Amino acid sequence: MRRGGLLASLIFLLAGALEPAQAGQTHVAVAANFAEPAKEIAALFKERTGDEALLSFGASGAFFTQITHDAPFQVFLSADEERPKAAVAQGFAAPGSVFTYAVGRLVLWSRVLDVSKGEETLKAGAFSRLSIANPAAAPYGAAAVETMKALGVYDALQPKIVRGNSIGQAFQFVDTRNAELGFVALSQVRGVPGGSQWLVPQALYTPIRQDAALLKKGADDPASKAFLEFLRGPEAKAIIERFGYGLE
């Protein structure tokens, strides 16, 4: 009996040792402009590692506020470089974990107007609604304001500006024709059929360096660390470039 019991115990332990390791999960806060590439990267990450990245999309400013109020995110993919650095400075992210994963490009886009000569379109002002993301919460919104000020049209266009909570909502306003045109991320209109766009010259706004950070809740989590490492790798970079982002 004792030998049989010992053998059964050994078989049980061996079976447990041979079971595949349970896949990990990481909760990732993703700036809305990066939604589509993030989905592709997460799918490939799961295929390569077995780990799952659970993605939430929104405005970087809103995410930062949630992170400082104990939200369960483990990784932060911001649309700017300031908030990830602030997260480290305030003790909400791991020191040394911040890096630039993409450099965003701003476009003026419309479903109904020819905006290919964007500066002329903005100066003429022959439209009733111009969509931008909330500049206080979304870096692409701040870049839109900076662009309009550089062109000397901001004051004249202010009454026509409608603000989305995020760049995702700003895109939706234009896509659904609730605004005739709007400033959105190049990544959002890559591959979108129809419409007209003007790629805003980089000289008109501060480069949109989008930084990632390993948050305090993910500092000891293997899946969170693995996701950020994958984000820095060649397969993820190829996806990022395909959506129109620059790399550093």
Whereabouts are the PLM-identified features?
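N-terminal secretory signal peptides that target proteins for export/translocation
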Residues: 1-2
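Bacterial N-terminal signal peptides
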Residues: 5-17
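Sec/Tat signal peptide C-region and signal peptidase I cleavage site
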Residues: 19-23
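Exported/periplasmic ABC-transporter solute-binding proteins
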Residues: 24-57, 61-71, 77-81, 85-91, ...
